[in-house]
């Protein structure tokens, strides 16, 4: 499978999943983006078109995180879960953004669940 095939497959899955679940203020969408070296997670309210919360491995407080990319992703998941609970958000819709539920995406989801988010 070539690089263009993978990108096209991801875009197709991304569009298909966006029509299924829209986030609200009470139950926002936990959107995950994974690059080659970094991972990003944000809580999105699709009704109002607003990002409620964002955490990434690029943030200043996360620059010193050590370990593998999967371990860092798990930590990012815990952080977004703790920050969401501090804002009173307990239930989210998980949007893997076309990425397979494996590796870093799975680690982020498990970290968020450990912190107390329900999805």
From Swiss-Prot:
CDD domains: Ribosomal_L18_L5e. Residues 9-19 have a biased composition (Basic residues). GO terms for biological process: translation. Signal peptide: none annotated. InterPro entries: Ribosomal_uL18_bac-type, Ribosomal_uL18_bac/euk. Keywords: Ribonucleoprotein, Ribosomal protein, RNA-binding, rRNA-binding. It comes from the Bacteria. One of its GO terms (molecular function) is structural constituent of ribosome. Residues 1-26 are annotated as: Disordered. One of its GO terms (cellular component) is cytosolic large ribosomal subunit. This is one of the proteins that bind and probably mediate the attachment of the 5S RNA into the large ribosomal subunit, where it forms part of the central protuberance. Belongs to the universal ribosomal protein uL18 family. Part of the 50S ribosomal subunit; part of the 5S rRNA/L5/L18/L25 subcomplex. Contacts the 5S and 23S rRNAs. This is Large ribosomal subunit protein uL18. The lineage of its organism: Bacteria, Pseudomonadati, Chlorobiota, Chlorobiia, Chlorobiales. The gene is rplR.
């Amino acid at each position: 499978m070539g690089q263009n095939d993978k990108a096209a497959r991801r875009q197709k899955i991304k569009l298909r999943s966006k029509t299924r679940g829209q986030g609200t203020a009470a139950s926002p969408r936990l959107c995950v983006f994974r690059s080659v070296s970094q991972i990003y997670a944000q809580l999105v309210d699709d009704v109002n078109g607003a990002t409620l919360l964002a955490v990434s491995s690029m943030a200043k407080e996360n620059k010193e995180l050590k370990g593998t990319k999967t371990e860092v992703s798990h930590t990012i998941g815990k952080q977004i879960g703790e920050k969401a609970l501090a804002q009173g958000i307990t239930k989210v819709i998980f949007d893997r953004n076309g990425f397979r539920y494996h590796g870093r995406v799975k680690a982020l989801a498990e970290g968020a669940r450990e912190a107390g988010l329900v999805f």
